[in-house]
């Protein structure tokens, strides 16, 4: 197994991980920022006010993008297993 193959697998794994986690992270950041702005303007400092909307948003985004995430992760796993099978031969 050459260095190029290892680097390719690692690059695919990192890019897939970033791609799969991006929708949930971005939605949580946006909702957290909006709630923080709302809290700053109204001077409400309740900690659960930021937690509950982020939790609901992450659950909904996970529900709507879960199939796509699973498809990407299974594709990466299949590529890695095919690479392992080619190395063993």
Swiss-Prot record:
Keywords of the record, alphabetical order, are: Bacterial flagellum, Cell membrane, Membrane, Transmembrane, Transmembrane helix
> What is the protein's membrane topology class?
Multi-pass membrane protein
Compartments annotated for it: namely: Cell membrane; Bacterial flagellum basal body
The organism's place on the tree of life at top rank: Bacteria
The main location is membrane
Q: Name one GO biological process term.
A: protein secretion
Q: Is Cell membrane among the key words of this record?
A: yes
Q: Where are the transmembrane segments?
A: 18-38, 55-75
Work out whether the entry's keyword set contains Magnesium. no
Query: GO cellular component terms?
Result: bacterial-type flagellum basal body; plasma membrane
Against Pfam families, the record matches this protein to: Bac_export_3
NCBIfam families, alphabetized: fliQ
PANTHER family for the chain: FLAGELLAR BIOSYNTHETIC PROTEIN FLIQ
**What does this protein do, in the record's words?**
Role in flagellar biosynthesis.
Family indicated by similarity: Belongs to the FliQ/MopD/SpaQ family.
Name under which the protein is recorded: Flagellar biosynthetic protein FliQ
């Amino acid at each position: 197994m050459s260095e190029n193959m290892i680097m390719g697998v690692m690059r695919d794994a990192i890019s897939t991980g970033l791609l799969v986690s991006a929708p949930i992270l971005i939605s949580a950041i946006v909702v957290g920022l909006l709630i923080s702005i709302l809290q700053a303007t109204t001077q409400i400092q309740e900690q659960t006010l930021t937690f509950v909307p982020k939790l609901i948003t992450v659950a909904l985004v996970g529900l709507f993008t879960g199939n796509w995430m699973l498809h990407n992760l299974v594709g990466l796993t299949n590529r890695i297993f095919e690479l392992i099978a080619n190395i063993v031969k």
